[in-house]
A protein has these predicted regions:
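Short acidic, hydrophobic short linear motifs in intrinsically disordered regions
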Residues: 21-35
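Short amphipathic alpha-helical interaction segments
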Residues: 38-54
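A short, conserved structural fragment
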Residues: 53-63
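Short beta-strand-to-loop capping motifs
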Residues: 37, 71-73
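Minor-groove-contacting beta-hairpin "wing" of winged helix-turn-helix DNA-binding domains
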Residues: 65-71
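Short alpha-helical segments that sit at the start of domains
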Residues: 1-23, 83
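Short, amphipathic alpha-helical interaction segments positioned at domain boundaries
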Residues: 74-84
Length: 84
């Protein structure tokens, strides 16, 4: 499987499992935690997160302490396809 796809699925599953929808969010720096060291240090993480934001699967909320990320409830079907 492609590294970027593995990272995307991991991030989506993590947020889905913790029910991070719309107003419940987490810091962008917490997303790669739990990945293997190989994938965590790769440059694919940043591009995978950027792609998910562009596809509007992830929503971003800028705060004074950093960027917060949550799942988009309007994209539930696409998110569930990635999770399963």
């Amino acid at each position: 499987m492609d590294e970027k796809l593995i990272i995307k699925k991991f991030i989506i599953r993590k947020l889905y499992r913790k029910r991070m929808w719309l107003h419940k969010h987490t810091n962008i720096h917490n997303l790669p935690k739990g990945l293997s060291n190989e994938l965590r240090v790769s440059r694919e993480i940043k591009s995978a997160i950027d792609e998910l934001l562009k596809e509007q699967i992830l929503l971003s909320k800028p705060t004074h302490y950093g960027l917060e990320i949550s799942l988009n409830p309007k994209k539930v079907k696409e998110i569930e396809e990635l999770v399963n």
